[in-house]
Amino acid sequence: MKSTVITLLFSLFICTSNAQIVGLSNEQIAVLKRKIKDDPEAKSLYKNFKAAAEDFLAQTPNPVDTIRTEGLLRGNPKKERTAIALRDINKMYTLALQYKITGEEKYLKKADEFLLAWANRNQPNGDPIDDTNLDKAIEAYDLIKDDVNPKDKTLIADWLKATALAEINSKRMNRNQGTGINNWNAHRLKVVGEIGYALNNQEFISWTIDRLKKHIEINLNEDGTSHDFKERDAMHYHIYDLEPMLRLALLIRSAGGGNFYTYESPKGSSIKKSVDWLIPYIKGEKQHEEYVNTTVKFDRDRAKNNEPGFGPGTMFKPSLALPVLKLSVYFDSAQANLLYTLNEKGKDWQMLIDEIKQNK
């Protein structure tokens, strides 16, 4: 019955206009501007954001032809080169958002320059662990897609479309095992969904929603555990699996497509149950030693490479769950106090943006 309701809701929102869903809408930008003007905390956060945007105006794009992070150990030259290049992603997003806040063309031109540089050079490889780094590039495009010239818009949109198609057509995606059902698939769905909403591509959106239902059934268990937790014996991967699903669920809800947080698969699994299962570990009521019984060689390789947090027996740190809580709180406000307690650094700029996005 729940599946039928969500399908019906999807049929209703499929006709929505090409408005911003991934990035802030014009109405939400207006809310942000009022907060910057009237709210001391928002004004303080904006001061640093504004300074960064100003600094990025003097910088030049540094794209890579292929993003390479997945399966590589710290210190690998390809991974290090990619890490440097990926700094561009936040730059283009910051410039795009600053343009929407100020209306100053210099920020639009620079954001466009960064996006075009990546669109012209980067070749999608269909690896979601690599492509998951493009969140802010997709959001940057969504923010300025109505303001760039048609030629540039087409070039950038074609790059994003190629990225989504590489994910959809990946042979590894089509297997009902391994990376076809683990955290890779969660990140794949998030990327294709974000691109679908940014491009208003209903085929991508429909594909994503259909496979999210399947992923919730295959990857999550009715007791709240996940395939990734059982495979890796690590909360780290339970969280890494939930975060993209939550981000996607928020997008779908924002577009009027139903609540995938509480959606239950035929076997009774749900994102909500898997977040709830995590809560006692976040509160410190339960503890977990990470990676003790992992079945994945890469985890052992990272431990041998002395990468922090990957040694067998490392105690799970509740603060590592912040990426989940910062999103799940918008489905379950009862988590707000826990988030406040855990988030020792206080509200940051991204939390302010998320708050505006979700508080309709």
Residue ranges and their predicted role:
Residues 90, 191, 243-247:
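Short amphipathic alpha-helical face segments that pack within enzyme cores
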Residues 6, 11, 63-64, 68-71, ...:
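Intrinsically disordered and other compositionally biased segments
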